[in-house]
């Protein structure tokens, strides 16, 4: 019985870490912008992975990051833009 109570206690003490997608913000509270010169390069992926995301790419001229930690600050945007950017080009192309 003590083991069952201890197990339940431990289950509730262990936090669940989830990931989120979005436009990560820099230390000024602004998202990283991408342009015609770096839209296809590694710029956004580098910015996102430095921010502890799994990967990132340029979407609507702003760097969009996948699997950011819960504590990462992201730009609050409308659902339609987020849904559009949630489909990674690398996921679509393979």
UniProtKB/Swiss-Prot annotation:
Disulfide topology = 34-85, 44-63, 48-65, 59-85
SUPFAM superfamilies the UniProt entry points to: Scorpion toxin-like
Query: What InterPro entries has UniProt attached to this entry?
Result: LCN-type_CS_alpha_beta_dom, Scorpion_toxin-like_sf, Scorpion_toxinL/defensin
Gene3D superfamilies per the UniProt record, alphabetical? Knottin, scorpion toxin-like
Keywords tagged on the record: Disulfide bond, Ion channel impairing toxin, Neurotoxin, Secreted, Signal, Toxin, Voltage-gated sodium channel impairing toxin
**What's a Gene Ontology MF term here?**
toxin activity
Record text about domains: Has the structural arrangement of an alpha-helix connected to antiparallel beta-sheets by disulfide bonds (CS-alpha/beta).
Report the sequence similarity comment from the record.
Answer: Belongs to the long (4 C-C) scorpion toxin superfamily. Sodium channel inhibitor family. Beta subfamily.
* Protein name, as recorded: Neurotoxin LmNaTx45.2
- Organism of origin is Lychas mucronatus (Chinese swimming scorpion)
